[in-house]
């Protein structure tokens, strides 16, 4: 709506959409609230370009070229961007997925289109994707390269205020800021590859991370903030305990395609499992003067943790970094539903749960697990829901929150089971 109004007022003004909302709606997509399939947001909004992903490289390149006087219509070759064009101006090489009208009427076509889209979000192996909208064609260029370590360090060395905008002061502030004000982002991307998750379409499956010095320096700066009470709420990211790419092969050939997962249903034999670097960082941060506690709240991938033969990190996690409750995401317990989700079998979670309580007892701590659970996942049946209820009762779990799946952009196994 705002883009159309801006275009009406200033027809010659270039408009570039970015951020999570635009990124996840760059192709024809299902709208949860309207319960229908919509065309690309590029068509609905009238924007000139969509910058998908985190967007730093794209923003700088587009701004530089616009400042040099280049018309926005000719800026069609920037990695990490999408634009609309007609058939005669499509690039020479591309992979095409089913168009808007086809995917709006055929769920299998939608699922196959989604598979093509997901398989081409890797910076090494990704190709240009084309999808016909109502009239024009959406062209997605290959993804932009993720920021490398020194670039991430520069981004997080900027003088952020760690406060909400002053405009909210008269409204009583933003209570939710308390959880993130003194939290540290240490990585981007996630190779977990859950079928319902949109992170792989935005940040990608390739994990990049900040240097240890950058993270420790940010923590040290926090200790001088007037509101800091000694507690760092999180040192994490999309998945807290991922620091590096999942294997050496992905650096050369890109991420595996065709729905292959690094962790589910079993751990890939090529995956490198190592918590030592993350552990060293946490030790340095908790030793800083003025720091009382360092918590991990952004989610531990428990199957990755259980795949580590060295349990030093697990022991220190339990002893130093749990604020009484640790959030983890088994999501369900029924084998049928877990397979559709791309999650590990519940037996893996059970082993993790037992060890967590065992280590907590040895550490003299009364701590609990808070499981993330999901309802309404496509393919999940009423029988599966009953199975989950019985599992929770048997294991004395009383979750206060359960996520009801909201579809925006998810991968083929989930799509194929949408009604």
Regions found by a protein language model. Name each.
Residues 13, 221-370, 374-378:
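Conserved SAM/AdoMet-binding glycine-rich loop
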Residues 1-133, 140-141:
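Glycine-rich beta-alpha loop elements in corrinoid/cobalamin-binding modules
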Residues 406-419:
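Residue-level detector of conserved catalytic or cofactor/ligand-binding positions
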Residues 378-393:
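Catalytic cores of alpha/beta
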């Amino acid at each position: 709506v705002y883009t159309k109004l801006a275009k009406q007022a200033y027809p010659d003004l270039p408009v570039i959409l970015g951020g999570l909302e635009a990124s996840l709606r760059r192709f024809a997509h299902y709208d949860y609230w309207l319960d229908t399939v919509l065309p690309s947001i590029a068509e609905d909004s009238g924007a000139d370009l969509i910058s998908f992903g985190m967007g730093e490289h794209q923003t700088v390149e587009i701004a530089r070229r616009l400042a040099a006087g280049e018309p926005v219509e000719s800026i069609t070759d920037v990695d990490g961007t999408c634009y609309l064009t007609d058939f005669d101006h499509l690039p020479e090489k591309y992979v095409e997925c089913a168009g808007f009208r086809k995917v709006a009427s055929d769920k299998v076509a939608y699922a196959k289109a989604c598979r093509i889209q997901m398989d081409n979000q890797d910076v090494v192996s990704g190709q240009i994707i084309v999808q016909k909208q109502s009239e024009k064609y959406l062209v997605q260029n290959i993804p932009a390269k993720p920021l490398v370590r020194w670039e991430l360090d520069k981004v997080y060395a900027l003088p952020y205020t760690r406060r909400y905008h002053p405009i909210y002061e008269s409204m009583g502030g933003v209570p939710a800021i308390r959880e993130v004000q003194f939290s540290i982002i240490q990585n981007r991307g996630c190779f977990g590859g859950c079928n319902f998750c949109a992170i792989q379409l935005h940040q990608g499956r390739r994990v990049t991370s900040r240097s240890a010095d950058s993270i420790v320096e940010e923590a040290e700066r926090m200790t001088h903030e007037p509101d800091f009470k000694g507690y760092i709420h999180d040192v994490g990211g999309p998945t807290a305990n991922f620091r590096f790419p999942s294997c050496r092969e992905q650096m050369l050939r890109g991420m595996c395609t065709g729905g292959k997962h690094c962790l589910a249903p079993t751990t890939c034999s090529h995956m490198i499992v190592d918590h030592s670097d993350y552990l060293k960082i946490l030790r340095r941060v908790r030793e800083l003067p003025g720091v009382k506690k360092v918590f991990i709240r952004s989610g531990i991938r428990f199957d990755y943790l259980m795949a580590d033969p060295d349990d030093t990190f697990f022991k220190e996690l339990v002893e130093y970094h749990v604020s009484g409750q640790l959030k983890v995401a088994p999501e369900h317990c029924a084998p049928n539903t877990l397979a559709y989700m791309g999650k590990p079998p519940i037996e893996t979670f059970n082993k993790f749960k037992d060890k967590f309580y065992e280590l907590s007892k040895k550490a003299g701590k009364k701590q609990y697990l808070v499981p993330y659970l999901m309802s309404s996942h496509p393919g999940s049946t009423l029988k599966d829901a009953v199975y989950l209820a019985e599992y929770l009762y048997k294991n004395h779990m009383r979750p206060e929150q359960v996520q009801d799946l909201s579809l925006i952009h998810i991968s083929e196994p989930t799509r194929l089971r949408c009604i």
